[in-house]
């Protein structure tokens, strides 16, 4: 399928909307009332630091809602205002924070049900309004909705669209797209649907395995088993890794994406030589500015003398998970929570360690004066960050009173 032509045709349809409905200002006003925080604004104005009692808070200098998320949420609010009585659906979570998605449900924006791992589009009727989330949607989903006569509101982040353009360039030149991402993540599912031949690699370890195979060969069956569900139909590692282009899920760790790109470039140089490297390797910068800014801000924050970190964001948020990796790798105790209710009485916290399920940690706040680093993922509203900070202040105040 010519995905580029389909996308162009869809965007020219009168049922397709990507720029809102002229009610953005009103939608943003409602959003600001619900999600902004006066405390967080004060902390920003105070050089991202705040002291209360024996707690000093250091906020990362880039955190929380990115402009792509703000745009997606505003468009969802605007859609409900513009279509007050129509059935409105969304193909996935709009963004990866439960509070925002719960608010959309309160506005009677319905999420498409997933049955046995597959989305059930049977309830969607012609004339229904369907929102595509910030992560985008696959070509097959867009085609189904268009054929059904739905009104499509596309909130796909422009940075995600930029990656789609990159893999389409790979496809046009018959390059295999090496996508750094999580193959089940909504964004990577969408990106791979625009690619021709593709392989999704999760991390540097998997990328190294692929590059070793390119240089030395190996067991094809083992390769295909290792990357099951992470490659295009008919993918053959013996023939489809001669020309590769690099792409990424925009929320992956910037430094790892860059390492993977350099690894593949070096591998193709070794195998084919510098004279023809451009016939075997392509790379475009598709690292999202907002993701990069938040990771860079976290790298600066962990240079401070912190007693611990709190990273706030949805547990299924890829960009939040990668923020959590930074202090952990620096040896700083860090807790990933999604909202303030995870901070329990008696100095306990329910948090999600990297790669594990939720667990309870007792005595998580040290006694005496402490310095706490705080950041949040790109889908987390400031009001959630405020609630977490207030909970920390309250916990330390209770400690002071009991002593």
Curated annotation (Swiss-Prot):
Top-level EC class: oxidoreductase
Catalysed reactions, semicolon-separated: isopentenyl diphosphate + 2 oxidized [2Fe-2S]-[ferredoxin] + H2O = (2E)-4-hydroxy-3-methylbut-2-enyl diphosphate + 2 reduced [2Fe-2S]-[ferredoxin] + 2 H(+); dimethylallyl diphosphate + 2 oxidized [2Fe-2S]-[ferredoxin] + H2O = (2E)-4-hydroxy-3-methylbut-2-enyl diphosphate + 2 reduced [2Fe-2S]-[ferredoxin] + 2 H(+)
Keyword terms: 4Fe-4S, Iron, Iron-sulfur, Isoprene biosynthesis, Metal-binding, Oxidoreductase
UniProt cross-references to Gene3D superfamilies, sorted A to Z: 3.40.50.11270, 4-hydroxy-3-methylbut-2-enyl diphosphate reductase, catalytic domain
Domain of life: Bacteria
A Pfam family it matches: LYTB
Positions annotated to bind [4Fe-4S] cluster: 66, 157, 288
Cofactor(s) needed for function: [4Fe-4S] cluster
GO molecular function, one term: metal ion binding
GO biological process: dimethylallyl diphosphate biosynthetic process; isopentenyl diphosphate biosynthetic process, methylerythritol 4-phosphate pathway; terpenoid biosynthetic process
Pathways involved: Isoprenoid biosynthesis; dimethylallyl diphosphate biosynthesis; dimethylallyl diphosphate from (2E)-4-hydroxy-3-methylbutenyl diphosphate: step 1/1; Isoprenoid biosynthesis; isopentenyl diphosphate biosynthesis via DXP pathway; isopentenyl diphosphate from 1-deoxy-D-xylulose 5-phosphate: step 6/6
Protein's UniProt name: 4-hydroxy-3-methylbut-2-enyl diphosphate reductase
Gene from which this protein is expressed: ispH
